[in-house]
Amino acid sequence: MLDKTRLRIAMQKSGRLSDESQELLARCGIKINLQQQRLIAFAENMPIDILRVRDDDIPGLVMDGVVDLGIIGENVLEEELLTRRAQGEDPRYFTLRRLDFGGCRLSLATSLDSEYTGPQSLQDARIATSYPHLLKQYLDKQGVRFKSCLLNGSVEVAPRAGLADAICDLVSTGATLEANGLREVEVIYRSKACLIQRDGEMPEAKQQLIDRLMTRIQGVIQARESKYIMLHAPSERLDEIVALLPGAERPTILPLAGAQNRVAMHMVSSETLFWETMEKLKALGASSILVLPIEKMME
């Protein structure tokens, strides 16, 4: 039995979000051996237990208070929320933050030779999906009547098998759709991974641990989105150079040995530094321009 004094986090055992969830926890300094095929893994350096489960089980585990936190795709979370509301339940949870991975879109797709002019083209159509409530929510708003064909996998083969006229499924590149004679016609939901917390009172020690974890996650995400920039620049062009780096804090200016009119600049930029920007920096007299990744960051 799990020790209820330890923080319990549910994450996908395998699949699209599993590797990135593991990487996030590792970069937050949580030491967990996730190589073995265990349903429960224990952190070595923090009172944290990881439950490795199917992704569609995670929202329910959080909403039912079985675990304290869950890392889950917003599409799966929203489908579970709509399902429970349809059953007359009042599910409760908190979204702590959206994460910077797991991006996908839930889309409608029809056969390549179909005439699609908008959602109304699907009036009275039979649509195969693993997300019946998200599909219904979207088409109800469009005033479209339809019949749902619930499939838990291989949704894209439904039209060829004669099970459906169209599908509603997750799309990344669209290659799978094309291979099955389908084309994406409408995006109905865009999703990323998110971190959610159960409703209800949380023991103080657990809440403090959650706060520490959130600070680390924020630092990891900021580090991914930021770059450390070092360059040499003419003293009289500093303001122009800083203006080219939106999102950058005021730079650290250091004297450059043997050069009275040039300085070394160090700064953190939260913006991607494109080649065009570097060329503009060089045109302003900057040299020795280095753009480095940041592993950890805390403000």
Curated annotation (Swiss-Prot):
Keywords attached to this entry? Amino-acid biosynthesis, ATP-binding, Cytoplasm, Glycosyltransferase, Histidine biosynthesis, Magnesium, Metal-binding, Nucleotide-binding, Transferase
Q: In which pathway does it act?
A: Amino-acid biosynthesis; L-histidine biosynthesis; L-histidine from 5-phospho-alpha-D-ribose 1-diphosphate: step 1/9
Compartments where located: Cytoplasm
Question: What is the top EC class of this enzyme, as a single word?
Answer: transferase
Q: Name one GO cellular component term.
A: cytoplasm
What cofactor does this one take? Mg(2+)
Q: What is its EC number?
A: 2.4.2.17
| One GO term of the biological process aspect | L-histidine biosynthetic process
Domain of life of the native organism: Bacteria
The similarity annotation says: Belongs to the ATP phosphoribosyltransferase family. Long subfamily.
Q: What is the name attached to this protein's record?
A: ATP phosphoribosyltransferase
* Organism lineage string: Bacteria, Pseudomonadati, Pseudomonadota, Gammaproteobacteria, Enterobacterales
Gene name for this UniProt entry: hisG
